[in-house]
C-alpha cells in the first residue's frame, strides 16, 4: 500500500543496527561515528503473522505471501537539525514521507561507543528529536501562513485555513506537538496536514535499545522511555539491537531456541514490525487456495469491494459478493469445505466491513 515507517534517532543509538536486523540485511553500514547513514536506506519487510502458517497447514499451498511494510533508515540528527545543522535538512525531508516514526533511544552503557552528548540520557535524547520536529513544523507553517495571508482577498477558504494555522503556530511555539493540538480533527487542520505533513503529528513508537543483560528486567533508562511512551499514549518496545542483528545469521529453529533461552516468545523486532503495522491503521484479510495462501493489507474500516480492489481494480468494479469465513472458523473446521458444512461460510455484500483475519473469496463480473 506504499506505507512506510521511518527509523530515527540521534547518532550512535543503534538505529542502523535495528534497521539491519529488521530487514535481515546488512544494507545500512553500522559504524561508531555520526551520520554513517547519509542517504535513507529503504527495505520492504514481511509482517510476521502466525495465522498464515496455520492456514497453510490446512490448505497446503505452493507458496505463502506475507503483508509487507516499508522501513526507512533515516540519517541521524543533532540539535539544530530544523535549522539545517548536521544532516538536518535531509533528515526532515525524508521523515516527512513516512506515516509512522520509530524512535530508537539508547538505553545501554558502553564506553566504547560514543554518545553525541557524551552521556546516556534517554529523555533528553527524546526531547532533542521531538523539539526538532516541532521547530521544523513551525518553519513549514510560517511559509504557509505567508501564502495564506496573500490569498485572503482572492480565496474564500484562506480565512479558515489561516485562523487554524495561526492557532496551530501558537500551540507549537509552546513546544507542544501537533498531535496534541485541540483542533487536530478539524477540516482546516486536516487540509493543512495533508499538504504540509506535520512531523509532530505523526504516530510514534519508542524503541529502547538495551544491553543483553537488561532484556528481561528493564534498566532505569528503559523504564523512563516506557513511562514517557505511556504518557504520550504511544507504543513501546525494548530490544537489544546488537543481539537482534546477530540473529540475522541464525536459522529459524536456532532463533526459536535462542528466544526460548531468553524466556520470550517473539523477538523485539517482530513486535516492532507488528506494532508498526498496527499504528499504520492496517489490518489483514486472507485468500487461501492451493496456489497460494496470502495476506492482503487494507485500511481498517474498508468495505468488501475496497478490499477486493487491493487484489485487482476489476474485482472492485465488478464486485458481486464476498464468500467469507472468519479465521477462527476456518481453522476450527479445517478449511472451506468444513466451514461450509457447519454453516460458517457467509455471503457478504458491498456494504460489508472486512474484519481482521477474514478469509475471503470474491465473486465479480466485468
Predicted regions and their residues:
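Short, glycine/charged-enriched secondary-structure capping and boundary segments
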Residues: 22, 84-87, 116-119, 219-222, ...
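Conserved nucleotide-binding/hydrolysis micro-motifs of P-loop NTPases
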Residues: 25, 51-52, 76-78, 106-112, ...
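A structural signal for alpha-helical segments
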Residues: 33, 86, 121, 153-160
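Flexible beta-alpha connector loops of hexameric P-loop NTPases
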Residues: 77-82, 118, 127-133, 152-157, ...
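Switch/coupling subdomain of P-loop NTPase systems
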Residues: 96, 100-103, 108-136, 140-143, ...
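Conserved G1/Walker A P-loop phosphate-binding module
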Residues: 1-114, 123, 142-143, 148
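C-terminal-of-GTPase-core extension/linker across diverse P-loop GTPases
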Residues: 2-8, 13, 19, 147-353, ...
